[in-house]
């Protein structure tokens, strides 16, 4: 019976076998060619990212090979052939998208959501970043030999070039001005990051502090790789300053509501408190950076709109409508005769000196 079954099986002819072998060979050629093209394209993207680092001054020619190898490691690659063609102008968002898509296709980037893509591309950008000590040394060298304004311009550009401040997302924000009886007001709708919920802010203030970093304003965020519920800060650099005799940090907000929107924060994880010392801290900062303003959110959860668990202020290089609003009344304060105070025409109580 087995013999009869075997006899009924029709063996493929020599011509059929030959045809199938050719088809298999063609399939393998196509796969190899596609892999080569894909690898070649990713090499081009890597070269573009390195050129971006050179063009922006994040790295020098001496850093080129090192930066390339760091990018290869993040991408899960162990070899590289530099493309002969020199890239033109670099669109950072497009280059990062190409690298992220490839990383997801090859399994290096497991999840293809915005959270995990942001975690991954921040690692890529860190391959181009100078160490914190280099940034700090250059900042204070410019501060001491040129001016505070030149120092902050260097640091702000670095924060943008590093993609810590994502220019292409900030560009989507809606901004306009409107004339009112209080003057011309600035209206902004931040689309790069949603506003905090007041209830969540209040709950956060009551929660027992744990974890690492304890919050998004802690010094320990510098260089932190991030996680699903905490943003990556591999490419983040902080400038250490002294405020009211204590160590503080100076950085820019990654979500920039206005020009050079900065955050000045306590070196220790301590709650916000508006008291006399808060005003001393404000004046200390503007003495160091006279071209900046500095202010504080309310230390109340309903109206603060801020991280109340960490003492900090916000400022920048911008003139708001409140600073230009008309004056309703002048007055002096006893024991401070050299200070002229003014009641400002504003929808809430406001005094300007």
Please provide the spans of the model-predicted regions:
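Low-complexity, intrinsically disordered or signal/transmembrane-proximal segments
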Residues: 6-10, 16-18
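Active-site microenvironments that recognize anionic phosphate/pyrophosphate groups
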Residues: 32-271, 345-348
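Helical scaffold of the NTase/Pol beta-like nucleotidyltransferase catalytic core
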Residues: 235-237, 269-294
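Histidine-centered divalent-metal-coordination microenvironment in nucleic-acid enzymes
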Residues: 259-266, 303-320
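Conserved His + Asp/Glu catalytic blocks
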Residues: 273, 293-294, 300-306, 317-353
């Amino acid at each position: 019976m087995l013999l009869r079954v075997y006899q009924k099986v029709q063996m493929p002819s020599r011509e059929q076998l030959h045809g199938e072998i050719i088809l298999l060979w063609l399939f393998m050629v196509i796969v190899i060619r596609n892999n080569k093209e894909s690898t070649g394209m990713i090499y081009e993207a890597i070269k573009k990212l390195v050129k971006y680092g050179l063009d922006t001054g994040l790295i020098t020619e001496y850093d080129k090979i090192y930066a390339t190898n760091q990018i290869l490691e993040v991408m899960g690659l162990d070899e590289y052939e530099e493309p002969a063609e020199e890239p033109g102008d670099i669109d950072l968002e497009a280059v990062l998208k190409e690298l992220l898509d490839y990383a997801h296709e090859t399994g290096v980037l497991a999840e293809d959501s915005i959270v995990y893509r942001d975690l991954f591309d921040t690692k890529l950008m860190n391959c181009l970043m100078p160490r914190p000590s280099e940034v700090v040394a250059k900042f204070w060298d410019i501060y001491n030999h040129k001016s505070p304004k030149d120092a902050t311009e260097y640091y702000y550009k670095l924060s943008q070039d590093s993609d810590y401040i994502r220019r292409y997302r900030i560009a989507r924000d809606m901004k306009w001005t409107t004339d009112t009886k209080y003057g011309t007001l600035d209206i902004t709708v931040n689309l790069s990051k949603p506003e905090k919920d007041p209830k969540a802010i209040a709950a956060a203030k009551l929660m027992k502090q744990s974890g690492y970093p304890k919050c998004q304003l802690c010094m320990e965020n510098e260089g932190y790789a991030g996680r699903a519920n905490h943003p990556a800060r591999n490419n983040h650099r902080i400038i250490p300053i002294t405020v009211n005799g204590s160590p503080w940090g100076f950085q820019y907000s990654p979500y920039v509501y206005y020009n050079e929107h900065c955050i000045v924060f306590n070196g220790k994880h301590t709650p916000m408190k508006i008291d006399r010392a808060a005003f001393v801290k404000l004046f200390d900062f503007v003495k160091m950076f006279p071209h900046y303003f500095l202010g504080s959110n309310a230390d109340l959860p309903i109206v603060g709109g801020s991280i109340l668990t960490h003492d900090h202020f916000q400022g920048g290089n911008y003139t708001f409508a409140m600073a230009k609003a008309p004056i309703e009344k002048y007055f002096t304060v006893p024991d401070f005769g050299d200070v002229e105070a003014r009641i400002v025409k504003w929808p809430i109580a406001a005094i300007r000196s």
